[in-house]
Protein backbone atom coordinates (compact mmCIF):
# COMPACT_ATOMS: atom_id res chain seq x y z
CA UNK A 1 0.00 0.00 0.00
CA UNK A 2 1.24 3.48 -0.93
CA UNK A 3 0.13 6.24 1.45
CA UNK A 4 0.33 9.85 0.28
CA UNK A 5 -0.51 12.65 2.72
CA UNK A 6 -0.94 16.27 1.63
CA UNK A 7 0.54 18.17 4.59
CA UNK A 8 0.90 21.81 3.53
CA UNK A 9 0.19 24.14 0.62
CA UNK A 10 2.35 27.26 0.23
CA UNK A 11 2.03 30.36 -1.92
CA UNK A 12 5.50 31.88 -2.31
CA UNK A 13 7.66 34.27 -4.23
CA UNK A 14 11.45 34.39 -4.35
CA UNK A 15 11.70 36.09 -0.94
CA UNK A 16 8.95 34.81 1.32
CA UNK A 17 5.93 32.64 1.99
CA UNK A 18 2.86 34.67 1.10
CA UNK A 19 0.31 32.15 2.39
CA UNK A 20 0.49 28.76 4.10
CA UNK A 21 -2.31 26.25 4.57
CA UNK A 22 -1.92 23.25 6.88
CA UNK A 23 -4.10 20.20 6.31
CA UNK A 24 -5.31 17.40 8.53
CA UNK A 25 -3.19 14.32 7.82
CA UNK A 26 -6.27 12.19 8.47
CA UNK A 27 -9.87 13.29 8.21
CA UNK A 28 -11.96 15.97 6.54
CA UNK A 29 -10.35 19.22 5.30
CA UNK A 30 -12.92 21.98 4.73
CA UNK A 31 -11.99 25.03 2.67
CA UNK A 32 -14.54 27.59 3.81
CA UNK A 33 -15.71 30.69 1.99
CA UNK A 34 -16.71 33.40 4.46
CA UNK A 35 -18.27 36.85 4.38
CA UNK A 36 -18.38 39.50 7.10
CA UNK A 37 -21.39 41.38 5.74
CA UNK A 38 -24.65 40.03 4.31
CA UNK A 39 -24.18 41.89 1.02
CA UNK A 40 -20.76 40.33 0.39
CA UNK A 41 -20.14 37.26 -1.76
CA UNK A 42 -18.23 34.13 -0.88
CA UNK A 43 -17.59 33.31 -4.53
CA UNK A 44 -14.29 34.50 -5.95
CA UNK A 45 -12.28 34.32 -2.74
CA UNK A 46 -10.15 31.40 -3.95
CA UNK A 47 -11.75 28.11 -2.89
CA UNK A 48 -11.71 26.60 -6.40
CA UNK A 49 -8.36 28.28 -7.07
CA UNK A 50 -6.87 26.37 -4.15
CA UNK A 51 -8.20 23.09 -5.53
CA UNK A 52 -6.89 23.92 -9.00
CA UNK A 53 -3.44 24.67 -7.58
CA UNK A 54 -3.39 21.30 -5.83
CA UNK A 55 -4.27 19.75 -9.22
CA UNK A 56 -1.43 21.67 -10.91
CA UNK A 57 0.99 20.44 -8.27
CA UNK A 58 -0.20 16.87 -8.87
CA UNK A 59 0.59 17.08 -12.58
CA UNK A 60 -2.32 18.86 -14.25
CA UNK A 61 -1.41 21.33 -17.00
CA UNK A 62 -1.58 24.93 -15.77
CA UNK A 63 -4.33 26.73 -17.69
CA UNK A 64 -3.81 29.92 -19.68
CA UNK A 65 -5.95 31.79 -17.16
CA UNK A 66 -2.99 31.63 -14.76
CA UNK A 67 -0.03 31.69 -17.15
CA UNK A 68 -1.23 34.92 -18.80
CA UNK A 69 -2.22 36.74 -15.60
CA UNK A 70 0.09 39.73 -15.26
CA UNK A 71 -0.38 40.05 -11.50
CA UNK A 72 0.77 36.46 -10.86
CA UNK A 73 3.64 36.80 -13.32
CA UNK A 74 4.85 40.16 -11.99
CA UNK A 75 4.76 38.89 -8.40
CA UNK A 76 6.73 35.82 -9.58
CA UNK A 77 4.36 33.53 -7.68
CA UNK A 78 5.09 29.85 -7.32
CA UNK A 79 3.05 27.29 -5.40
CA UNK A 80 4.41 24.46 -3.28
CA UNK A 81 2.84 21.27 -1.97
CA UNK A 82 4.43 19.47 0.93
CA UNK A 83 3.54 15.79 0.69
CA UNK A 84 4.54 12.70 2.59
CA UNK A 85 4.77 9.50 0.55
CA UNK A 86 5.37 6.30 2.49
CA UNK A 87 7.02 8.32 5.27
CA UNK A 88 9.29 10.32 2.95
CA UNK A 89 8.80 14.08 2.73
CA UNK A 90 8.80 15.70 -0.72
CA UNK A 91 8.15 19.28 -1.83
CA UNK A 92 6.47 19.74 -5.20
CA UNK A 93 6.44 23.16 -6.87
CA UNK A 94 5.09 24.87 -9.99
CA UNK A 95 5.84 28.39 -11.19
CA UNK A 96 3.31 30.39 -13.20
CA UNK A 97 6.26 31.99 -15.02
CA UNK A 98 7.47 28.55 -16.08
CA UNK A 99 4.33 26.44 -16.65
CA UNK A 100 6.13 23.87 -18.81
CA UNK A 101 8.33 22.78 -15.92
CA UNK A 102 7.94 21.26 -12.49
CA UNK A 103 10.19 21.34 -9.42
CA UNK A 104 10.95 18.73 -6.78
CA UNK A 105 12.86 19.01 -3.53
CA UNK A 106 13.71 16.11 -1.23
CA UNK A 107 14.41 17.95 2.01
CA UNK A 108 12.94 18.61 5.43
CA UNK A 109 12.65 22.37 4.98
CA UNK A 110 11.35 24.66 2.26
CA UNK A 111 13.60 27.02 0.30
CA UNK A 112 12.40 29.98 -1.79
CA UNK A 113 15.28 29.74 -4.24
CA UNK A 114 14.10 27.57 -7.12
CA UNK A 115 17.72 27.16 -8.20
CA UNK A 116 18.12 24.73 -5.31
CA UNK A 117 15.21 22.63 -6.58
CA UNK A 118 15.40 19.97 -9.24
CA UNK A 119 13.83 21.53 -12.33
CA UNK A 120 12.40 19.10 -14.90
CA UNK A 121 10.14 19.25 -17.95
CA UNK A 122 6.44 18.88 -17.28
CA UNK A 123 6.46 15.41 -18.88
CA UNK A 124 9.23 14.25 -16.52
CA UNK A 125 7.43 15.91 -13.60
CA UNK A 126 4.21 14.03 -14.41
CA UNK A 127 6.13 10.75 -14.60
CA UNK A 128 7.64 11.51 -11.19
CA UNK A 129 4.17 12.07 -9.71
CA UNK A 130 2.96 8.89 -11.41
CA UNK A 131 5.82 6.82 -10.05
CA UNK A 132 5.58 8.18 -6.51
CA UNK A 133 1.82 7.78 -6.16
CA UNK A 134 1.04 4.56 -8.07
CA UNK A 135 4.45 2.84 -8.12
CA UNK A 136 3.48 1.18 -11.42
CA UNK A 137 0.61 -0.79 -9.87
CA UNK A 138 -1.23 -1.05 -13.20
CA UNK A 139 0.50 -0.54 -16.53
CA UNK A 140 -2.57 0.86 -18.28
CA UNK A 141 -3.83 2.98 -15.35
CA UNK A 142 -2.32 6.44 -14.96
CA UNK A 143 -2.67 8.90 -12.12
CA UNK A 144 -3.28 11.65 -14.71
CA UNK A 145 -6.44 9.82 -15.82
CA UNK A 146 -7.53 9.01 -12.27
CA UNK A 147 -6.98 12.59 -11.14
CA UNK A 148 -10.25 13.73 -12.77
CA UNK A 149 -12.16 11.35 -10.50
CA UNK A 150 -10.06 11.95 -7.40
CA UNK A 151 -10.40 15.74 -7.83
CA UNK A 152 -13.92 16.34 -9.13
CA UNK A 153 -14.21 19.59 -11.11
CA UNK A 154 -17.09 21.81 -9.98
CA UNK A 155 -18.10 22.68 -13.56
CA UNK A 156 -18.26 19.23 -15.18
CA UNK A 157 -17.62 16.65 -12.46
CA UNK A 158 -21.05 16.56 -10.84
CA UNK A 159 -23.45 16.00 -13.73
CA UNK A 160 -23.12 12.22 -13.52
CA UNK A 161 -20.97 9.54 -11.94
CA UNK A 162 -19.05 9.38 -15.23
CA UNK A 163 -17.41 12.42 -16.80
CA UNK A 164 -18.71 14.00 -20.03
CA UNK A 165 -17.03 13.52 -23.41
CA UNK A 166 -14.95 10.55 -22.30
CA UNK A 167 -14.83 7.07 -23.86
CA UNK A 168 -16.92 4.51 -22.03
CA UNK A 169 -14.22 1.85 -21.99
CA UNK A 170 -11.69 4.14 -20.32
CA UNK A 171 -14.21 5.62 -17.89
CA UNK A 172 -15.36 2.28 -16.51
CA UNK A 173 -11.81 0.94 -16.43
CA UNK A 174 -10.79 3.86 -14.17
CA UNK A 175 -13.89 3.57 -11.97
CA UNK A 176 -13.39 -0.20 -11.67
CA UNK A 177 -9.83 0.48 -10.52
CA UNK A 178 -11.05 2.90 -7.85
CA UNK A 179 -13.61 0.34 -6.68
CA UNK A 180 -10.82 -2.33 -6.68
CA UNK A 181 -12.57 -4.40 -9.37
CA UNK A 182 -10.98 -5.95 -12.51
CA UNK A 183 -9.92 -3.34 -15.07
CA UNK A 184 -8.73 -5.48 -17.97
CA UNK A 185 -11.79 -7.46 -19.04
CA UNK A 186 -13.41 -5.19 -21.64
CA UNK A 187 -10.08 -3.94 -23.01
CA UNK A 188 -8.72 -7.44 -23.62
CA UNK A 189 -11.93 -8.63 -25.30
CA UNK A 190 -11.95 -5.50 -27.46
CA UNK A 191 -8.58 -6.56 -28.90
CA UNK A 192 -10.30 -9.61 -30.43
CA UNK A 193 -13.30 -7.55 -31.54
CA UNK A 194 -11.05 -5.03 -33.30
CA UNK A 195 -9.34 -7.85 -35.20
CA UNK A 196 -12.75 -9.22 -36.26
CA UNK A 197 -13.84 -5.77 -37.41
CA UNK A 198 -10.71 -5.43 -39.53
CA UNK A 199 -11.26 -8.86 -41.09
CA UNK A 200 -14.91 -8.02 -41.82
CA UNK A 201 -13.74 -4.93 -43.69
CA UNK A 202 -11.51 -7.13 -45.85
CA UNK A 203 -14.46 -9.41 -46.61
CA UNK A 204 -16.62 -6.46 -47.65
CA UNK A 205 -13.84 -5.30 -49.96
CA UNK A 206 -13.58 -8.73 -51.61
CA UNK A 207 -17.35 -9.00 -51.97
CA UNK A 208 -17.41 -5.62 -53.70
CA UNK A 209 -15.38 -7.22 -56.54
CA UNK A 210 -18.40 -9.40 -57.52
CA UNK A 211 -16.50 -12.68 -57.87
CA UNK A 212 -18.40 -15.71 -59.33
CA UNK A 213 -16.26 -18.66 -58.30
CA UNK A 214 -18.08 -21.20 -60.52
CA UNK A 215 -17.47 -19.25 -63.73
CA UNK A 216 -13.85 -18.65 -62.76
CA UNK A 217 -13.16 -22.37 -62.18
CA UNK A 218 -14.60 -23.26 -65.61
CA UNK A 219 -12.55 -20.51 -67.24
CA UNK A 220 -9.40 -21.73 -65.49
CA UNK A 221 -9.82 -25.28 -66.90
CA UNK A 222 -10.44 -23.93 -70.42
CA UNK A 223 -7.31 -21.79 -70.34
CA UNK A 224 -5.16 -24.64 -68.98
CA UNK A 225 -6.25 -26.89 -71.87
CA UNK A 226 -5.61 -24.17 -74.48
CA UNK A 227 -2.14 -23.47 -73.09
CA UNK A 228 -1.28 -27.18 -73.14
CA UNK A 229 -2.27 -27.30 -76.83
CA UNK A 230 0.01 -24.35 -77.60
CA UNK A 231 2.83 -26.00 -75.66
CA UNK A 232 2.58 -29.12 -77.84
CA UNK A 233 2.68 -27.06 -81.03
CA UNK A 234 5.68 -25.07 -79.82
CA UNK A 235 7.48 -28.21 -78.71
CA UNK A 236 6.98 -29.88 -82.09
CA UNK A 237 8.18 -26.77 -83.86
CA UNK A 238 11.27 -26.44 -81.69
CA UNK A 239 12.36 -30.03 -82.39
CA UNK A 240 12.57 -29.59 -86.19
CA UNK A 241 16.10 -30.62 -87.27
CA UNK A 242 16.63 -27.70 -89.63
CA UNK A 243 16.15 -25.13 -86.90
CA UNK A 244 16.96 -27.17 -83.84
CA UNK A 245 20.09 -25.41 -82.60
CA UNK A 246 19.05 -21.85 -83.38
CA UNK A 247 15.44 -22.16 -82.31
CA UNK A 248 16.37 -23.70 -78.94
CA UNK A 249 18.24 -20.52 -78.06
CA UNK A 250 15.45 -18.40 -79.51
CA UNK A 251 12.78 -20.33 -77.56
CA UNK A 252 14.66 -20.09 -74.27
CA UNK A 253 14.96 -16.34 -74.56
CA UNK A 254 11.38 -16.03 -75.73
CA UNK A 255 10.15 -18.17 -72.83
CA UNK A 256 12.02 -16.07 -70.31
CA UNK A 257 10.72 -12.93 -71.94
CA UNK A 258 7.19 -14.29 -71.75
CA UNK A 259 7.58 -14.96 -68.04
CA UNK A 260 8.82 -11.42 -67.45
CA UNK A 261 6.00 -10.00 -69.57
CA UNK A 262 3.53 -12.15 -67.66
CA UNK A 263 4.83 -10.80 -64.35
CA UNK A 264 4.63 -7.24 -65.70
CA UNK A 265 1.04 -7.77 -66.79
CA UNK A 266 0.02 -9.30 -63.48
CA UNK A 267 1.59 -6.45 -61.54
CA UNK A 268 0.03 -3.83 -63.82
CA UNK A 269 -3.33 -5.55 -63.44
CA UNK A 270 -3.04 -5.62 -59.64
CA UNK A 271 -1.89 -2.00 -59.62
CA UNK A 272 -4.91 -0.97 -61.72
CA UNK A 273 -7.22 -2.96 -59.46
CA UNK A 274 -5.84 -1.21 -56.36
CA UNK A 275 -6.24 2.17 -58.07
CA UNK A 276 -9.83 1.30 -59.02
CA UNK A 277 -10.49 0.38 -55.39
CA UNK A 278 -9.08 3.75 -54.24
CA UNK A 279 -11.15 5.59 -56.88
CA UNK A 280 -14.31 3.69 -55.90
CA UNK A 281 -13.80 4.52 -52.23
CA UNK A 282 -13.22 8.19 -53.01
CA UNK A 283 -16.32 8.32 -55.25
CA UNK A 284 -18.44 6.77 -52.51
CA UNK A 285 -17.08 9.20 -49.91
CA UNK A 286 -17.83 12.07 -52.33
CA UNK A 287 -21.39 10.82 -52.72
CA UNK A 288 -21.72 10.53 -48.95
CA UNK A 289 -20.47 14.11 -48.56
CA UNK A 290 -23.10 15.24 -51.08
CA UNK A 291 -25.62 14.06 -48.48
CA UNK A 292 -24.25 16.35 -45.76
CA UNK A 293 -27.17 18.73 -46.26
CA UNK A 294 -29.73 15.94 -45.87
CA UNK A 295 -30.35 16.89 -42.23
CA UNK A 296 -31.26 20.46 -43.26
CA UNK A 297 -33.44 19.06 -46.07
CA UNK A 298 -35.44 16.94 -43.63
CA UNK A 299 -35.77 19.81 -41.17
CA UNK A 300 -36.96 22.17 -43.94
CA UNK A 301 -39.50 19.67 -45.32
CA UNK A 302 -40.80 17.74 -42.32
CA UNK A 303 -39.45 19.78 -39.42
CA UNK A 304 -37.16 17.15 -37.93
CA UNK A 305 -34.39 14.74 -38.87
CA UNK A 306 -35.49 11.09 -38.36
CA UNK A 307 -33.20 9.32 -35.90
CA UNK A 308 -33.11 6.15 -38.03
CA UNK A 309 -31.99 8.08 -41.11
CA UNK A 310 -29.41 9.91 -39.04
CA UNK A 311 -28.01 6.67 -37.61
CA UNK A 312 -27.87 4.99 -41.04
CA UNK A 313 -26.21 8.04 -42.56
CA UNK A 314 -23.64 8.23 -39.73
CA UNK A 315 -22.86 4.51 -40.02
CA UNK A 316 -22.37 4.73 -43.79
CA UNK A 317 -20.24 7.84 -43.49
CA UNK A 318 -18.16 6.30 -40.68
CA UNK A 319 -17.60 3.11 -42.66
CA UNK A 320 -16.42 4.81 -45.84
CA UNK A 321 -14.24 7.30 -43.99
CA UNK A 322 -12.61 4.33 -42.27
CA UNK A 323 -12.19 2.57 -45.61
CA UNK A 324 -10.55 5.61 -47.22
CA UNK A 325 -8.17 6.14 -44.30
CA UNK A 326 -7.32 2.51 -43.66
CA UNK A 327 -7.70 0.62 -46.92
CA UNK A 328 -6.89 3.65 -49.08
CA UNK A 329 -3.49 3.97 -47.41
CA UNK A 330 -3.01 0.21 -47.68
CA UNK A 331 -3.70 0.26 -51.46
CA UNK A 332 -1.43 3.26 -52.01
CA UNK A 333 1.46 1.55 -50.22
CA UNK A 334 0.90 -1.55 -52.35
CA UNK A 335 0.90 0.54 -55.56
CA UNK A 336 4.25 2.15 -54.66
CA UNK A 337 5.83 -1.28 -54.03
CA UNK A 338 4.41 -2.76 -57.24
CA UNK A 339 5.65 0.19 -59.32
CA UNK A 340 9.15 -0.33 -57.92
CA UNK A 341 8.97 -4.01 -58.95
CA UNK A 342 7.69 -3.03 -62.42
CA UNK A 343 10.69 -0.79 -62.96
CA UNK A 344 13.06 -3.70 -62.30
CA UNK A 345 11.04 -6.05 -64.52
CA UNK A 346 11.01 -3.59 -67.45
CA UNK A 347 14.80 -3.25 -67.27
CA UNK A 348 15.10 -7.04 -67.41
CA UNK A 349 12.57 -7.19 -70.24
CA UNK A 350 14.60 -4.69 -72.28
CA UNK A 351 17.71 -6.87 -71.96
CA UNK A 352 15.87 -10.02 -73.04
CA UNK A 353 14.27 -8.21 -75.97
CA UNK A 354 17.70 -7.23 -77.27
CA UNK A 355 18.92 -10.83 -76.90
CA UNK A 356 15.84 -12.11 -78.73
CA UNK A 357 16.41 -9.76 -81.65
CA UNK A 358 20.00 -10.94 -81.90
CA UNK A 359 18.95 -14.61 -81.85
CA UNK A 360 16.29 -13.97 -84.49
CA UNK A 361 18.86 -12.59 -86.92
CA UNK A 362 20.79 -15.85 -86.72
CA UNK A 363 17.85 -17.83 -88.04
CA UNK A 364 17.76 -17.97 -91.86
CA UNK A 365 14.05 -18.53 -92.24
CA UNK A 366 11.99 -15.41 -91.51
CA UNK A 367 8.82 -17.43 -92.06
CA UNK A 368 9.77 -19.81 -89.27
CA UNK A 369 10.40 -16.96 -86.84
CA UNK A 370 7.11 -15.38 -87.72
CA UNK A 371 5.17 -18.65 -87.32
CA UNK A 372 6.66 -19.60 -83.94
CA UNK A 373 6.30 -16.01 -82.72
CA UNK A 374 2.57 -16.03 -83.47
CA UNK A 375 2.09 -19.30 -81.60
CA UNK A 376 4.16 -18.19 -78.61
CA UNK A 377 2.43 -14.79 -78.50
CA UNK A 378 -0.96 -16.48 -78.36
CA UNK A 379 0.33 -18.79 -75.64
CA UNK A 380 1.59 -15.79 -73.65
CA UNK A 381 -1.79 -14.06 -73.95
CA UNK A 382 -3.56 -17.15 -72.59
CA UNK A 383 -1.08 -17.46 -69.72
CA UNK A 384 -1.71 -13.84 -68.75
CA UNK A 385 -5.45 -14.44 -68.85
CA UNK A 386 -4.98 -17.55 -66.70
CA UNK A 387 -2.93 -15.57 -64.17
CA UNK A 388 -5.73 -13.01 -63.93
CA UNK A 389 -8.35 -15.73 -63.37
CA UNK A 390 -6.23 -17.41 -60.70
CA UNK A 391 -5.73 -14.08 -58.98
CA UNK A 392 -9.49 -13.62 -58.68
CA UNK A 393 -9.89 -17.22 -57.45
CA UNK A 394 -7.20 -16.52 -54.86
CA UNK A 395 -9.18 -13.48 -53.67
CA UNK A 396 -12.26 -15.66 -53.24
CA UNK A 397 -10.29 -18.36 -51.41
CA UNK A 398 -8.86 -15.63 -49.17
CA UNK A 399 -12.41 -14.74 -48.09
CA UNK A 400 -12.96 -18.29 -46.83
CA UNK A 401 -9.66 -18.11 -44.98
CA UNK A 402 -10.76 -14.83 -43.38
CA UNK A 403 -14.02 -16.44 -42.26
CA UNK A 404 -11.97 -19.17 -40.59
CA UNK A 405 -9.95 -16.54 -38.73
CA UNK A 406 -13.12 -14.74 -37.63
CA UNK A 407 -14.60 -18.00 -36.31
CA UNK A 408 -11.41 -18.67 -34.35
CA UNK A 409 -11.49 -15.18 -32.83
CA UNK A 410 -15.17 -15.50 -31.92
CA UNK A 411 -14.48 -18.79 -30.15
CA UNK A 412 -11.64 -17.10 -28.29
CA UNK A 413 -13.97 -14.29 -27.22
CA UNK A 414 -16.42 -16.87 -25.85
CA UNK A 415 -13.65 -18.60 -23.91
CA UNK A 416 -12.10 -15.41 -22.53
CA UNK A 417 -15.47 -13.85 -21.74
CA UNK A 418 -16.51 -16.91 -19.74
CA UNK A 419 -13.22 -16.81 -17.85
CA UNK A 420 -13.60 -13.08 -17.08
CA UNK A 421 -17.19 -13.54 -15.94
CA UNK A 422 -16.04 -16.17 -13.46
CA UNK A 423 -13.32 -13.78 -12.33
CA UNK A 424 -15.90 -11.03 -11.74
CA UNK A 425 -18.06 -13.46 -9.76
CA UNK A 426 -15.10 -14.03 -7.43
CA UNK A 427 -15.34 -10.35 -6.42
CA UNK A 428 -18.84 -10.81 -4.98
CA UNK A 429 -17.66 -10.15 -1.41
CA UNK A 430 -16.11 -6.83 -2.44
CA UNK A 431 -19.24 -5.86 -4.37
CA UNK A 432 -21.40 -6.65 -1.32
CA UNK A 433 -19.19 -4.54 0.93
CA UNK A 434 -19.29 -1.62 -1.53
CA UNK A 435 -23.09 -1.75 -1.68
CA UNK A 436 -23.24 -1.90 2.12
CA UNK A 437 -20.98 1.16 2.40
CA UNK A 438 -23.07 3.09 -0.12
CA UNK A 439 -26.34 2.38 1.66
CA UNK A 440 -24.80 3.15 5.03
CA UNK A 441 -23.83 6.60 3.72
CA UNK A 442 -27.33 7.03 2.32
CA UNK A 443 -28.82 6.05 5.67
CA UNK A 444 -26.58 8.51 7.53
CA UNK A 445 -27.36 11.32 5.10
CA UNK A 446 -31.01 10.84 4.17
CA UNK A 447 -32.22 7.94 6.31
CA UNK A 448 -32.96 6.22 2.97
CA UNK A 449 -31.43 3.56 0.77
CA UNK A 450 -30.15 4.06 -2.74
CA UNK A 451 -29.07 1.76 -5.54
CA UNK A 452 -25.47 0.89 -6.40
CA UNK A 453 -24.89 -2.04 -8.71
CA UNK A 454 -21.97 -3.62 -10.58
CA UNK A 455 -22.88 -5.73 -13.61
CA UNK A 456 -20.60 -7.68 -15.93
CA UNK A 457 -21.72 -7.32 -19.56
CA UNK A 458 -21.81 -10.96 -20.61
CA UNK A 459 -23.51 -10.40 -23.97
CA UNK A 460 -21.62 -11.51 -27.08
CA UNK A 461 -22.26 -9.14 -29.96
CA UNK A 462 -20.58 -8.30 -33.26
CA UNK A 463 -21.87 -4.73 -33.11
CA UNK A 464 -19.20 -2.06 -33.25
CA UNK A 465 -20.48 -0.44 -30.05
CA UNK A 466 -20.53 -3.74 -28.16
CA UNK A 467 -19.33 -3.52 -24.54
CA UNK A 468 -18.68 -7.20 -23.89
CA UNK A 469 -16.56 -7.59 -20.76
CA UNK A 470 -17.40 -4.16 -19.35
CA UNK A 471 -18.14 -4.02 -15.64
CA UNK A 472 -20.93 -1.46 -15.68
CA UNK A 473 -21.73 0.65 -12.65
CA UNK A 474 -25.24 1.93 -11.96
CA UNK A 475 -26.10 4.38 -9.21
CA UNK A 476 -29.31 6.13 -8.22
CA UNK A 477 -30.96 7.63 -5.16
CA UNK A 478 -34.52 8.82 -4.49
CA UNK A 479 -35.44 12.24 -5.95
CA UNK A 480 -32.08 12.65 -7.70
CA UNK A 481 -33.59 14.90 -10.36
CA UNK A 482 -33.00 17.85 -8.04
CA UNK A 483 -29.52 19.38 -8.30
CA UNK A 484 -28.90 19.04 -4.58
CA UNK A 485 -29.74 15.33 -4.53
CA UNK A 486 -27.80 14.69 -7.75
CA UNK A 487 -24.67 16.31 -6.35
CA UNK A 488 -25.03 14.42 -3.09
CA UNK A 489 -25.47 11.16 -5.01
CA UNK A 490 -22.12 11.73 -6.72
CA UNK A 491 -20.52 12.70 -3.39
CA UNK A 492 -21.74 9.45 -1.82
CA UNK A 493 -20.76 7.45 -4.92
CA UNK A 494 -17.17 8.72 -4.69
CA UNK A 495 -17.07 8.39 -0.92
CA UNK A 496 -18.01 4.72 -1.29
CA UNK A 497 -14.84 3.78 -3.19
CA UNK A 498 -12.81 6.23 -1.10
CA UNK A 499 -13.90 4.76 2.25
CA UNK A 500 -13.51 1.21 0.94
CA UNK A 501 -9.90 1.93 -0.05
CA UNK A 502 -9.21 3.55 3.33
CA UNK A 503 -10.83 0.74 5.32
CA UNK A 504 -8.96 -1.93 3.34
CA UNK A 505 -5.68 0.03 3.30
CA UNK A 506 -5.47 0.37 -0.49
CA UNK A 507 -3.40 3.03 -2.27
CA UNK A 508 -4.94 6.40 -3.22
CA UNK A 509 -6.44 7.68 0.01
CA UNK A 510 -7.29 11.22 -1.12
CA UNK A 511 -10.60 12.56 -2.43
CA UNK A 512 -11.35 16.19 -3.33
CA UNK A 513 -14.81 17.61 -4.04
CA UNK A 514 -14.99 21.20 -5.21
CA UNK A 515 -18.37 22.93 -5.11
CA UNK A 516 -20.50 19.80 -4.70
CA UNK A 517 -21.89 20.84 -1.30
CA UNK A 518 -23.43 24.12 -2.48
CA UNK A 519 -26.77 22.71 -3.68
CA UNK A 520 -27.59 19.88 -1.23
CA UNK A 521 -29.92 20.45 1.72
CA UNK A 522 -28.03 22.25 4.57
CA UNK A 523 -29.51 19.78 7.08
CA UNK A 524 -27.62 16.81 5.58
CA UNK A 525 -24.21 18.30 4.71
CA UNK A 526 -22.83 18.55 8.23
CA UNK A 527 -24.14 15.10 9.16
CA UNK A 528 -22.32 13.44 6.26
CA UNK A 529 -19.07 15.38 6.76
CA UNK A 530 -18.94 14.52 10.48
CA UNK A 531 -19.58 10.84 9.69
CA UNK A 532 -16.79 10.75 7.08
CA UNK A 533 -14.38 12.43 9.49
CA UNK A 534 -15.15 9.85 12.20
CA UNK A 535 -14.70 6.95 9.75
CA UNK A 536 -11.33 8.23 8.54
CA UNK A 537 -10.08 8.86 12.09
CA UNK A 538 -11.24 5.38 13.09
CA UNK A 539 -9.27 3.80 10.25
CA UNK A 540 -6.37 6.27 10.75
CA UNK A 541 -6.00 6.93 7.03
CA UNK A 542 -7.49 9.13 4.32
CA UNK A 543 -7.94 12.82 3.50
CA UNK A 544 -11.23 14.26 2.22
CA UNK A 545 -11.08 17.84 0.91
CA UNK A 546 -14.24 19.86 0.27
CA UNK A 547 -15.04 23.47 -0.56
CA UNK A 548 -18.13 25.02 0.98
CA UNK A 549 -19.49 28.44 1.85
CA UNK A 550 -20.18 29.44 5.43
CA UNK A 551 -23.81 30.32 4.75
CA UNK A 552 -24.45 26.85 3.26
CA UNK A 553 -24.03 25.14 6.64
CA UNK A 554 -26.26 25.13 9.68
CA UNK A 555 -24.76 27.20 12.50
CA UNK A 556 -24.61 24.22 14.88
CA UNK A 557 -22.85 22.11 12.24
CA UNK A 558 -20.43 24.94 11.45
CA UNK A 559 -19.47 25.32 15.10
CA UNK A 560 -18.97 21.58 15.55
CA UNK A 561 -16.94 21.23 12.36
CA UNK A 562 -14.71 24.08 13.49
CA UNK A 563 -14.35 22.74 17.02
CA UNK A 564 -13.17 19.41 15.64
CA UNK A 565 -10.52 21.13 13.51
CA UNK A 566 -12.08 20.16 10.20
CA UNK A 567 -12.02 23.72 8.79
CA UNK A 568 -8.46 24.20 7.51
CA UNK A 569 -8.88 27.40 5.49
CA UNK A 570 -11.15 30.44 5.80
CA UNK A 571 -11.17 32.61 2.70
CA UNK A 572 -12.84 36.00 2.31
CA UNK A 573 -12.36 39.51 0.87
CA UNK A 574 -11.34 41.18 4.13
CA UNK A 575 -8.00 42.42 5.44
CA UNK A 576 -7.31 44.22 2.15
CA UNK A 577 -7.79 40.94 0.24
CA UNK A 578 -5.04 39.24 2.24
CA UNK A 579 -7.56 36.61 3.30
CA UNK A 580 -7.97 35.44 -0.28
CA UNK A 581 -6.20 32.26 -1.32
CA UNK A 582 -3.15 33.96 -2.85
CA UNK A 583 -3.18 36.75 -0.27
CA UNK A 584 -4.10 39.29 -2.91
CA UNK A 585 -6.71 39.88 -5.57
CA UNK A 586 -5.84 38.86 -9.12
From Swiss-Prot:
Gene3D superfamilies noted in UniProt: P-loop containing nucleotide triphosphate hydrolases (3.40.50.300)
Coiled-coil intervals: 183-293, 331-400
Keywords for the protein's UniProt record, in alphabetical order: Coiled coil
InterPro entries recorded: DUF2326 (IPR018760), P-loop_NTPase (IPR027417)
Gene giving rise to this polypeptide: yydD
Keyword Coiled coil: yes
Species whose genome carries this gene: Bacillus subtilis (strain 168)
Transmembrane intervals: none
Annotated protein name in UniProt: Uncharacterized protein YydD
Coiled coil listed as a keyword: yes
